[in-house]
UniProtKB/Swiss-Prot annotation:
Its EC number is 2.1.1.197. Keywords: Biotin biosynthesis, Methyltransferase, S-adenosyl-L-methionine, Transferase. It comes from Paenibacillus sp. (strain JDR-2). The lineage of its organism: Bacteria, Bacillati, Bacillota, Bacilli, Bacillales. Belongs to the methyltransferase superfamily. GO terms for biological process: biotin biosynthetic process; methylation. It holds the Pfam family Methyltransf_23. This is Malonyl-[acyl-carrier protein] O-methyltransferase. Pathway: Cofactor biosynthesis; biotin biosynthesis.
Amino acid sequence: MNNPKTAIQRQFNRSAAGSYDIHADVQRTMAAELAKSIIERNSRGKATEPKILEIGCGTGQFTELLLNQWPHVSITALDLAPAMIHTAEQRFKSRQSANIRFLQADVEIWAVEAPSDSFDLIVSNACFQWLSHPRQTISHLKRFLREGGSLVFTTFGPNTFLELHQAFAEVYHAYGMEPQRHGLSVLSTNQWEEVLAEAGFSTIYCQQDTQKETYASPRDFLRSIKSMGASHSEAIPIDGLSPRKLFNEMYKVYEEKFNMKDGIVATYEWLLIYAG
């Protein structure tokens, strides 16, 4: 059986060369809101230059926002994909003052043995939806935090790509089949609050937002997702409905139900979560 993390790593390695930054408009919005929240909260705290762990640094977009605020801050920036780490390193090659340690690792494995009380702030932008074991991983992250430290992150919510899921479901029902989820199953705000409380966080704040994006067609929408490395699916092939037929039928339903003047619409639901 294929390891899902290996497939995810391969997808993001392919997108690191440039296609990710071109297509990641929603992730940029999430990063800007995350940075704004962190800066506002930190300005009221004690640590003006916190020691930071960034999980899922990608090409370094969010890392750059942190450095623009704190030029001499100490950051450990971790990512699963080696090509993403390489791209991020190149982004900061000319910033000699930057105190960044880049680390290629799966956070869910790395976190098991990483030292306690190591960071003032743990941040992550548009990454935690990829966690296979969020409860265990969040528990480890809580252990990393020094007294008074916090975990602040954005992630995608369950209503992300709701049009796509509805279109697929209609096709499955038309063939008398149980719908499968094409994409990730992600946690809701209530589920995240439960996970964080179980890990020992006492102050938890969740903010939800929805962003609508338009694409020329369902095919263009899926190409954009693939260009960002986010084409992983939990669905498996079914006898009697080939992938080609399934997708062609889905395209028809999508265009019929979610057509707009400029193409088709796709919903992104994202969550901004603070835990301290």
